[in-house]
Amino acid sequence: MAKEIERKFLVKSDGWRSEVSSSSDFLQAYVASGDDRSVRVRIMDGKRAKLTIKIGRELLARDEFEYEIPLGDAEEMANAAVGVVLQKTRHEVRHEGYTWEVDVYDGAYKGLVVAEVEVEDEGALPDIPDWIGEEITGDRRYSNMVMATEDLSGELCHGVPSAAR
């Protein structure tokens, strides 16, 4: 079991684009969700798939179990998704010793751009790049599970700066 500790931010500009080291297209579907746990399937670049179980109420730190699964199984699970299937492109950006994951959403959340950084403990805060905006760690509306199961696309995509999209 791994403990996932990550901070999440809105992205306010496209200054990160010139620093991208890799990118992957994700299709992310929730098979089950509850107040303190979720089961999701993720298909990466249409070629690989993972099943992830997250347990814990805190959005900053949760237990995470992740397993590679056959692509066909993942596609079948995605077809049985609860709510909206999320579509996004994840870009990795290195900054001051940390890897930032910048998610550019498509589909229902087109226009939303968020960045996450995994940290070693709950008090850690890495050097913040200038393209990072408001911290949204702990704001449940930006949890992928909530976005998928409650469809907040109208609320979350409103007012996103066009430069960040």
What kind of feature is each model-predicted range?
Residues 1-165:
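Phosphate-end processing signature that detects enzymes handling 5′-triphosphorylated RNA
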